[in-house]
Amino acid sequence: MTIQIFGTVCIDKVRKIEEFPKSLGTYTPVISEQILLGGEASNTFVCINEWVEKGQESIKLIVPPLVDDLNGKFIINKLNQSTGKTSDKNVIFTQIQEINNNNENNYLKYTPITDIYVCNKKERTMFGIGFPEIDQYMVQCKEIKEKILNVDLQFGPNHWISLDANYPLINREVIKKSIITNTNLYIMDQELDTVVDELSLENTSIEHTSNLIFQSSSDHFGNKDGPIKEFFNIMNQWFQKDNGIFKKFLFILTDSKNGFGIGGTWNNEWIEPYWFTPSAIPSDKVVDTTGAGDSFRAGLIFSLVHKNQSLSDSLEFASACGALNCLSIGGCSSTPTLNSINQFLKLNNKNQMFL
């Protein structure tokens, strides 16, 4: 079995500030800045890579096209450092594009960058550049699209593919081929209605697809810090869409430190939506919440899929991963170790795992 993480790999410029401006046109000083490896796919892969046995090649990061500029080289070096292994086995680079400023039709002009501002309330706001261009490039360049779908990614019931929402156009193609080939999917935040409609037009159903996991948050669905009852309403409305086709998914709807709702189908069994309240890091210990959801995804993939543990234990493990990732700046600059996760689980009277 191969677990493939495909999605956002970028540079994160993380800037700490006291508070966000209260009005336009005002000045806010930056306390500090760090330039880090970032992106949902990077954050998830670096976490899992910390835990797998050395020499393990079943966990792969599929990197979207990069530009061979200083930022692209920075990402490549950081990924090579993080794996500690030969990159061609665990990290697959779709394309390293030479800089070409003369071609106006060339979408791939620069490596994507995110400016992240973290305030004293530990909340962050992000500004990105280069992401839609790469998405367009991956679907409009026939050679690259074919390489992603027929060479870089492996499909079939013995494989998993995990996606995030920043490249929706190429994601649709990956999701459709995954459904057709009965490939397991773990999807974060991606809009799915369009894909389901397109599959329906092609007389293809997701009914018999292997395992489907959909993770999203109150940032996308609303009701942030709101009543739990409303989260269940949101989840049930989602399950009822398109004649109930989304009931095939295991749906995880998170609300930051407050917990998450979970329900749907796992291993062909229906789970009635319920609320999961995780053990939390004290608020005064939180440094930055960037990548918490990615680390949660990493924990669930590692425990539930890679190690075949129970759903309840895997949720505890994933929650601990997400919480501990908030103790440092950036999404994957200092990922939690198995030892630190087990200490956290023990401290909160939970089952320790993978000792």
Curated annotation (Swiss-Prot):
InterPro entries registered for this protein in UniProt: Carboh/pur_kinase_PfkB_CS (IPR002173), PfkB_dom (IPR011611), Ribokinase-like (IPR029056)
Entries under Gene3D superfamilies matching the protein: 3.40.1190.20
GO molecular function: ATP binding; ketohexokinase activity
GO biological process: fructose metabolic process; regulation of glycogen metabolic process; response to fructose; response to glucose; response to insulin; response to sucrose; response to zinc ion
Enzyme Commission number, as recorded: 2.7.1.-
GO cellular component, one term: cytoplasm
Assigned protein family: Belongs to the carbohydrate kinase PfkB family.
Protein name as it appears in the record: Uncharacterized sugar kinase
Organism the protein comes from: Dictyostelium discoideum (Social amoeba)
